[in-house]
Amino acid sequence: MLKKTLAALALGSALFTAGQAMAADYKIDKEGQHAFIEFRIKHLGYSWLYGRFNDFDGSFTFDEKNPSADKVKVTINTNSVDTNHAERDKHLRSGDFLNVGKNPTATFESTEVKANGDSADITGNLTLNGVTKPVTIKAKLLGQGNDPWGGYRAGFEGSATLKLKDFGIKMDLGPASQEVELLLSVEGIRQ
């Protein structure tokens, strides 16, 4: 009897573990403040100016054993740009930068994921300011597992660098401020 019980427990554990590693779809948990899309740009070459987008939605497919099957899709409300300075945010929403009246959303949709040791390169099409260009996000799995509410989560961080002029942003901020760095932290809830 004990052998059968131990065998059943071992089989159940193996199936449970295998189930955790299989491909799954995740919804980005922005409601619990477990996801952030932030950016930084040099200010005159002396310091960093940080900002974020407060309103976005997204999902991803994660298959730890087959990263090439992974997918990411995110939509950002560009009007939600926030640098903690109302006048600057108003200027960022204008035609000089994001032109939110004409381009109320920015989107990213992956086209390829390549594993690179303990990280991955997520390449996809970013549409920002009405311009679509390929962008590669350097991403890393931070962790995954069961949450206290009966769900399963996976968390990642990532970064990418964008040239403002590539996305039709012609405002000249000086030689030190031609690029903006995206800083991403995402926690997804398995669906």
UniProtKB/Swiss-Prot annotation:
InterPro entries: Lipid/polyisoprenoid-bd_YceI, TTHA0802/YceI-like_sf, UPF0312/YceI
Gene3D superfamilies for this protein: Lipid/polyisoprenoid-binding, YceI-like
Signal peptide start and end residues: 1-23
Localisation per UniProt entry: Periplasm
Keywords: Periplasm, Signal
A single cellular component GO annotation: periplasmic space
Family matches, as PANTHER family: PROTEIN YCEI
Similarity comment: Belongs to the UPF0312 family. Type 1 subfamily.
Protein name per UniProt: UPF0312 protein PSPA7_0523
